[in-house]
């Protein structure tokens, strides 16, 4: 028997010996149970060693903003369901001046358990800041581009080491599209709305998620 894949808050990972292994919200488990499926919870896998806690990541961002005020600015675009800040680091030669130059947006950790995303984003930020004025290619990039890096879009999911936000929604499937203007998994979540409100007014934008 196949598991319905269109249930909100359900992400099937694999199937072994007739059993489905999936990430599922409480609402998705209730819906599966109502459909006659037997569900069993397993302990949450702990975050792999070596990856920083959210507080440490935020502290690093604050430290860099203080160390490199001439080429970066830390700002907040919204909050998660649990009121955790959604932080963005802007890197450019004049962070307090609106200049006519290309804009680049880098969003990581839309899924809270994809930890390597924030790691790459944070290393990218650090490399740009510490190489500016030393590496001519990095200096040219920063001088001519308005770079915005969001290391963790889903802070609640990151803390819980969970794919979903605290409401049980997969944020990657929550954005509107031409065929689903209310989002593929409505309603729109605060993290999704924060990124949309942040992105829509921007011009000349290249994005990586």
Task: Go through each PLM region and give its residues.
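Conserved beta-strand termini and adjacent loop/short-helix elements that scaffold enzyme active sites
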Residues: 42, 77, 150-152
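Intrinsic-disorder/low-complexity accessory segments
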Residues: 1-57
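A mature extracytoplasmic/lumenal domain signature
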Residues: 26-28, 36, 43, 92-93, ...
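Short glycine-aromatic motifs
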Residues: 10, 69-73, 145
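A residue-level signal for conserved active-site and pocket-lining positions in enzyme catalytic cores
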Residues: 32, 83, 171
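Soluble metallo-hydrolase cores and metallopeptidase-like ectodomains found primarily
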Residues: 49-104
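Active-site/substrate-binding loop(s) of hydrolase catalytic cores
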Residues: 98-209
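Conserved beta-strand segments of alpha/beta enzyme cores
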Residues: 38, 73, 87, 146-148
């Amino acid at each position: 028997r196949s598991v319905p894949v269109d249930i909100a808050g359900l992400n099937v990972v694999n199937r072994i010996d007739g059993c489905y292994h999936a990430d599922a919200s409480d609402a998705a488990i209730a819906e599966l149970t109502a459909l006659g499926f037997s569900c069993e919870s397993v302990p949450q896998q702990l975050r792999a060693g070596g990856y920083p806690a959210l507080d440490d990541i935020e502290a690093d961002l604050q430290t860099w903003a203080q160390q490199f005020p001439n080429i970066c600015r830390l700002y907040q675009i919204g909050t998660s369901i649990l009121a955790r800040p959604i932080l963005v680091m802007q890197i450019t030669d004049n962070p307090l001046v609106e200049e006519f130059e290309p804009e680049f947006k880098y969003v990581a950790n839309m899924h809270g358990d994809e930890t390597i995303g924030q790691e790459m984003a944070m290393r990218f930020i650090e490399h740009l800041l510490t190489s500016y004025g030393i590496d001519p290619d990095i200096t040219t990039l920063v001088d001519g581009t308005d770079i915005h890096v969001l290391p963790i879009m889903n802070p609640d999911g990151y803390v819980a080491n969970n794919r979903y936000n605290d409401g049980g929604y997969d944020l990657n499937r929550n954005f509107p599209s031409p065929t689903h203007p209310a989002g593929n998994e409505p309603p729109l979540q605060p993290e999704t709305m924060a990124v949309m409100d942040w992105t829509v007014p921007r011009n000349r934008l290249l994005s990586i998620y």
